[in-house]
Amino acid sequence: KAFYHDFLEWLGYKQIVGGKDFAGWGNGEAEIFVTYLERYKDSGFHRRRVGLNHMAFQAKSRADVDRLYSEFLVPRNIKVLYGGPKEYPEYRKGYYAVYFEDPDRIKLEFVD
């Protein structure tokens, strides 16, 4: 929960609801809810199983992608994937993103 609180607040989301085992954040355009039950913690997450592969968040600019990397990910020692922010021309022209993992190894993407 602490990771998503810090990450989503950094992106400009505000916490709109919270309880013992859940929390939700919104930014006026989207809402994100996270649940965390201790009894399921040991089963782990793998993005290749059926279900969620990763979550992507839209950046306003390439500079915002770089800023997330340098101001949020690196100082917190968050695991960054694929060498950091870069272009992915195989997706589309100008696709610029940074991929990283949350503490449960869920892959996240911040893309311009």
Kindly label every feature range from the protein language model.
Residues 27-69:
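Long, continuous compositionally biased terminal/linker segments
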Residues 1-33:
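Core segments of cupin and vicinal oxygen chelate
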Residues 19-21, 53, 96:
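Residue-level marker for the onset of beta-strands and adjacent loop->beta junctions
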Residues 14-18, 88, 111-112:
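Conserved catalytic-core motifs of GNAT/GCN5-like acyltransferases
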Residues 56-103:
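Vicinal oxygen chelate
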Residues 100-112:
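Short, contiguous alpha-helical
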